[in-house]
């Protein structure tokens, strides 16, 4: 039997990149999926591919994570179709990267905060009663940008570190409800990173040299399968943790 047979997993930003890799990993273990994002065509394409390849059901919903009402609608549709929620994965995030802190505007900070920590906050609150029923789990995505203070990432890092703090408190408060809350900090090869590699090959090679394993993570195999573990019974005693999937870069105690 597959580890997540007939589970229901919500993945924000599930139509591309890391989110789609996670979707593939969960589908391979038998979980039905709810994929959210801002581009309908991308979500529909993801649904068709996943259902054809893995034989699971996928509900695609266009939703902006900064819109609380849109998130309420996502959960309403999820319960109407599947009747339960086992895992919530807050993966989506929008931000302006590459700007020094002194060049960030309030609008830049708002963009990161609303699409990041507010989205995670809204989703977690509305999913709580359903996760309590299933003794489910939350997997929130943060970043090495905050953990290691990477230049040019101040608004993004602020949002991601806020998500880590929110997650630790939720792990404490929701433990008695049987809900586990963990954080993943990935360093994965995505579509945008592939473009960056092509446009800046020398900078890419310099970056790779700082990763002891010598590569970026694969979204499905290196990120998605760890998320499957965190959502499964194998991780039943794991909560409040930050899992750094960075290939050894930024080693910390």
Predicted regions and their residues:
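Conserved glycine-rich cofactor-binding loop
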Residues: 13-17
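Active-site helix of classical SDR
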Residues: 124, 159, 167
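Short C-terminal tail/terminal secondary-structure segment
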Residues: 98, 148, 239-253
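Residue(s) in the substrate-gating loop at a strand-loop-helix junction
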Residues: 143
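Catalytic Tyr-x(3-8)-Lys segment
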Residues: 202-221
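Short, small/polar-rich loop/turn modules that mediate ligand/substrate recognition or access, typified
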Residues: 175, 180, 238-240
């Amino acid at each position: 039997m597959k580890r997540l047979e007939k589970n229901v997993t919500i993945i924000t930003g599930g139509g591309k990149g890391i989110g789609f890799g996670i979707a593939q990993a969960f589908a391979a273990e038998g979980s039905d999926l709810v994929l959210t994002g801002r581009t309908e065509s991308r979500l529909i394409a993801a649904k068709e591919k996943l259902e054809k390849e893995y034989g699971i059901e996928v509900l695609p919903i266009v939703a902006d994570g900064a819109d609380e009402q849109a998130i309420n609608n996502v959960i309403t549709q999820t319960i109407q179709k599947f009747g339960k929620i086992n895992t919530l994965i807050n993966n989506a995030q929008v931000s302006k990267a590459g700007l020094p802190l002194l060049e960030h505007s309030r609008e830049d900070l708002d963009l990161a905060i609303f699409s990041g920590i507010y989205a995670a906050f809204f989703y977690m609150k509305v999913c709580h009663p359903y996760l309590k029923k299933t003794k489910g789990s939350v997997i929130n995505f943060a970043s090495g940008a905050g953990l290691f203070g990477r230049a040019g990432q101040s608004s993004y890092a602020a949002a991601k570190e806020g998500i880590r703090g929110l997650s630790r408190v939720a792990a404490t408060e929701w433990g008695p409800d049987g809900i586990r809350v963990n954080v993943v900090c990935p360093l994965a090869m995505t579509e945008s990173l592939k473009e960056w590699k092509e446009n800046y090959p020398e900078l890419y090679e310099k970056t790779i040299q700082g990763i002891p394993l010598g590569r970026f993570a694969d979204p499905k195999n290196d990120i998605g399968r760890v998320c499957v573990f965190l959502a499964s019974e194998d991780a039943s005693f794991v909560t409040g943790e930050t899992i750094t999937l960075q290939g050894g870069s930024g080693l910390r105690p």
